[in-house]
Amino acid sequence: MQELFNNLMELCKDSQRKFFYSDDVSASGRTYRIFSYNYASYSDWLLPDALECRGIMFEMDGEKPVRIASRPMEKFFNLNENPFTMNIDLNDVDYILTKEDGSLVSTYLDGDEILFKSKGSIKSEQALMANGILMNINHHRLRDRLKELAEDGFTANFEFVAPTNRIVLAYQEMKIILLNVRENETGEYISYDDIYKDATLRPYLVERYEIDSPKWIEEAKNAENIEGYVAVMKDGSHFKIKSDWYVSLHSTKSSLDNPEKLFKTIIDGASDDLKAMYADDEYSYRKIEAFETTYLKYLDRALFLVLDCHNKHCGKDRKTYAMEAQGVAKGAGMDHLFGIIMSLYQGYDSQEKVMCEIEQNFLKNYKKFIPEGY
């Protein structure tokens, strides 16, 4: 555990736009640290334990990790999105699972209470609504079983879906769908068959399909009214296949012809879908990567400038702080960041809010950043 924690802390030192952590205190008074990411490239994911920086949560005692409290799935990618999922022997696919279109929520034990966290928070709207489902008397057997699993050191990962949590697909009721169960210390997964044998977990379990056609990938891409599938390899690794129908709605295929829409797709985290769709189109693939690189370089610089300025001057009076902020933003040729630096002084309490402001300001000024040749 300590080595994993140290590697995750090291990742967060490099660039806050890539990997970061946030601390929060639960209702029981316990402190938790969640490691996650904003944007990262293939080379970033090659770093030690980077793939685990996707919502893993530690209970903390000061700066010392006490235990891994929750372990979501590691980061995995679309087929042909990057070298991780290129040249895969498809004969090694064991089975496929329906890819649900909601928000990941994962269990953790807070004292003697079983609760959900989302990818980045123990207090997000999705986590709180999922907790509400768990507390419903109709799900008391599930709640008791998940608590037993957590006490034994396992995380149950679910997809939270609801009419009010729509991404692309419309769900008619609020529910949680069990994706997998993972051992906190080792990261190993309980097999689908073993989960299916559990009469309490089975009704919540995501649907599995055996591969019965050599053209299953083509059929998956041509499917409609579904996000896609998660393919599980015989060695336990995963990759995603998304339907062209879903990608066209989520990331808007037409965004390739519109710089503003393409930047928006990147900011929304949907460029991976586009790259997978255009894996065989060299010009389009390189265009997406060029826009990605431009935005990520900007984000690195902007986030560092904003946070560094605030950290250096936050103890000063408002007038002095404003003068320093104005000088920093103007000196960097990024006057539009002045308002964000001032927002920090006024009490922005999370990097997520800062990121949102930077993203919105970038889109307002996107014409300045269109890569040469496009």
From Swiss-Prot:
Changing residue 272 to A: No effect on the ligation of 5'-PO4 and 3'-OH termini of the RNA strand and no effect on tRNA repair. Changing residue 101 to N/S/E: Complete loss of ligase activity. Changing residue 246 to A: Complete loss of ligation of 5'-PO4 and 3'-OH termini of the RNA strand and complete loss of tRNA repair; no effect on adenylyltransferase activity. Binds 2 magnesium ions that perform the catalytic activity via a two-metal mechanism. One of the catalytic Mg(2+), which is coordinated by 5 water molecules, engages the lysine nucleophile and the ATP alpha phosphate while the Mg(2+) orients the PPi leaving group. ATP binds at residues 37, 54, 75, 159, 240, 242. The keyword Metal-binding applies. The N-terminus contains the nucleotidyltransferase domain. The C-terminus probably confers tRNA specificity. Mg(2+) binds at residue 272. It comes from the Viruses. The active site is at residue 99. It comes from Enterobacteria phage T4 (Bacteriophage T4). Changing residue 100 to T: About 50% loss of ligase activity. Changing residue 37 to A: No effect on the ligation of 5'-PO4 and 3'-OH termini of the RNA strand and on tRNA repair. Keywords: ATP-binding, Evasion of bacteria-mediated translation shutoff by virus, Host-virus interaction, Ligase, Magnesium, Metal-binding, Nucleotide-binding, RNA repair. This is RNA ligase 1. It catalyses: ATP + (ribonucleotide)n-3'-hydroxyl + 5'-phospho-(ribonucleotide)m = (ribonucleotide)n+m + AMP + diphosphate. Changing residue 159 to A: Complete loss of ligation of 5'-PO4 and 3'-OH termini of the RNA strand and complete loss of tRNA repair. Changing residue 230 to A: Partial loss of the ligation of 5'-PO4 and 3'-OH termini of the RNA strand; no effect on tRNA repair. InterPro entries: Rnl1, T4-Rnl1-like_N, T4_Rnl1_C. It holds the Pfam family RNA_lig_T4_1. GO terms for molecular function: ATP binding; metal ion binding; RNA ligase (ATP) activity. Belongs to the Tequatrovirus RNA ligase 1 family. Optimum pH is 8.0. Changing residue 165 to A: Partial loss of the ligation of 5'-PO4 and 3'-OH termini of the RNA strand; no effect on tRNA repair. Its cofactor is Mg(2+).
